[in-house]
């Protein structure tokens, strides 16, 4: 038995399922999860000392790579001045100014401690601002574990086969309407059936919690037009895509201006950070300037702000986002070429520093329904073979993968060499 397996058995005695976030339990791929002891650059090292090329990146935040010197030094420096004050600091201002500069639609920014807090707060704000109770989300999209958002959700909820969670009262869930991602007709139908009742649409601009699904041409433009016509707010949940798709986030990449934006992951540089922001007239509805209440003991934590500020400063240096996108493209197209070589039909999607691959003979993957038709069992086999070859992919067919600036030609070459061997084995087993 490996040390990771021993730790997992021990963890299950005191931690529900042995993990503090469900997808980490490897329920979507089988077997026992690896327990991580340390990480550096593009590599993670498990409790048994084995190294893996990491394409999970702590589920997105580690865009510079693990243990980056600039972030590490910023954290140490901030920690030496105090861990938490529960009072305003200049670092919060610096961080808000930088975020607003990079994402112009975020005229004002409120810091929180997680992506879930960001989306939960943005939806409360949208309801308070519009005076409407209903919200619209998309099937397979995940926006954190707030009650109103765990309806036909993606991510770990989808991995475990429970996209709509028990514990969410039906009377509460009725205020959440679910449309089909990449299908504007489904959006129009819901607005027509709920005239004047919908406060907002919340959407992942690139769906990353049913693997990786970019928008089809005209989808986001259509959402913007519909929201304007119906008096609803458009919320971009950029917790995953923020600063990973492009320097000015997915909204800059697709040239769409949402009313509100939610951020997380990358803006913390590995620390627990979230944020939401948008038009000043809307943000002024948040307490203490407005009636919509939102608060948090650790919001704007000085150590977390220092980490996030350092991360964004390095990430936005000239050429870095382009290099990240190039690396991702090489990896994704390499997977597809090798899968085809071994007679294994595959679709790959990629944008910026995120990617997804699907074992399927479908031409494209654009909706949740398309994803559910893919060969999940083949994905499980590929995941476990790659893990044995020292490559750590997302342990779920419904999660996007991530590259970092620390991934270079050496890591991509090693990953594709491993994939070649794994595809060959799967092809041989399929005969």
Swiss-Prot record:
Cofactor: pyridoxal 5'-phosphate
Keywords: Cytoplasm, Isomerase, Porphyrin biosynthesis, Pyridoxal phosphate
Pfam families in alphabetical order: Aminotran_3
Alphabetical list of InterPro entries matching this protein: 4pyrrol_synth_GluAld_NH2Trfase, Aminotrans_3, Aminotrans_3_PPA_site, PyrdxlP-dep_Trfase, PyrdxlP-dep_Trfase_major, PyrdxlP-dep_Trfase_small
Coiled coil: none
Keyword Protein biosynthesis annotated: no
Residues annotated as transmembrane: none
GO terms under biological process: protoporphyrinogen IX biosynthetic process
Domain of life of the organism encoding this protein: Bacteria
Location in the cell: Cytoplasm
Broad class of enzyme this protein falls into: isomerase
GO MF terms, alphabetically ordered: glutamate-1-semialdehyde 2,1-aminomutase activity; pyridoxal phosphate binding; transaminase activity
Family in the record: Belongs to the class-III pyridoxal-phosphate-dependent aminotransferase family. HemL subfamily.
Assembly with partners or alone: Homodimer.
The protein's name: Glutamate-1-semialdehyde 2,1-aminomutase
Gene source species: Aliivibrio salmonicida (strain LFI1238) (Vibrio salmonicida (strain LFI1238))
